[in-house]
Amino acid sequence: MQDVLLQVQAVSKSYHDGDVTTQVLSDVDLQVFKGEQLAIVGTSGSGKSTLLHIMGTLDKPSSGKVLLAGEDLYQVSSARQAQIRNQDLGFIYQFHHLLPEFTALENVAMPAFIQGRDRTLAQADAKVLLERVGLGHRMSHIPAELSGGERQRVAIARALINKPKLVLADEPTGNLDAKSGEAVYELIRELANQLGTAFVVVTHDPKLAARMDRQLTMKNGYLQVPESAQ
């Protein structure tokens, strides 16, 4: 039996603007297992990014629970949430959000610096990760000197620097050409297998999602249950 890492229990999310209520998520239940690679697919506006943000404590559910390793993420202090984000979760976005004035090495090491780790040890770990993603020769380059695919590889290494239990990726290949996008997905799979890190990847591309261990579909705020699970 697989060990459950993250549980989403009856999560709903709505926004209110005066008398108008917009329902974004409706009673979503989901389990993410340790070390698995899960894709969530759906069209724009289906609610998949909102779900990912709630899983990462970047947005709060209107109702329901999210538990990481048994800990209810919305019953802890904001300080504890910040600690969880930095220590137990990694994030990858469509746009890399690298700090432009810092080198690839410094960008990867930054979350470890924020955590208060020894700078020399943090940079040593960052070097190992950059070599692992094929950028050992680009460590001293700033983001403007890197290609789009290289910048996203730096972002993946940064997401892994604190050895998170779970990495949440929101359209990680959405800003890349097809070849670079495929390379990023292969890298995610390779790293997940090597490190035992769980990945949840939100994407609109079913072909890329099919490479993951499991895929689920969001539609109009509902998580579709595969026929095999019904």
Curated annotation (Swiss-Prot):
Entry's Gene Ontology molecular function annotations: ATP binding; ATP hydrolysis activity; transmembrane transporter activity
Membrane topology, as annotated: Peripheral membrane protein
EC primary class: translocase
Subcellular location: Cell inner membrane
InterPro entries for this protein: AAA+_ATPase, ABC_transporter-like_ATP-bd, ABC_transporter-like_CS, ABC_transpr_LolD-like, LolD_lipo_ATP-bd, MacB-like_ATP-bd, P-loop_NTPase
Keywords associated with the record: ATP-binding, Cell inner membrane, Cell membrane, Membrane, Nucleotide-binding, Translocase, Transport
Pfam family name, one: ABC_tran
Gene3D superfamilies: P-loop containing nucleotide triphosphate hydrolases
Endpoints of the signal sequence: none
Highest taxon listed in the record's lineage: Bacteria
GO biological process: lipoprotein localization to outer membrane; protein localization to outer membrane; transmembrane transport
Function: Part of the ABC transporter complex LolCDE involved in the translocation of mature outer membrane-directed lipoproteins, from the inner membrane to the periplasmic chaperone, LolA. Responsible for the formation of the LolA-lipoprotein complex in an ATP-dependent manner.
The family this protein is said to belong to: Belongs to the ABC transporter superfamily. Lipoprotein translocase (TC 3.A.1.125) family.
Subunit structure: The complex is composed of two ATP-binding proteins (LolD) and two transmembrane proteins (LolC and LolE).
Classification via PANTHER family: IMPORT ATP-BINDING PROTEIN (PTHR24220), LIPOPROTEIN-RELEASING SYSTEM ATP-BINDING PROTEIN LOLD (PTHR24220:SF689)
Full protein name: Lipoprotein-releasing system ATP-binding protein LolD
Lineage of the species this protein comes from: Bacteria, Pseudomonadati, Pseudomonadota, Gammaproteobacteria, Alteromonadales
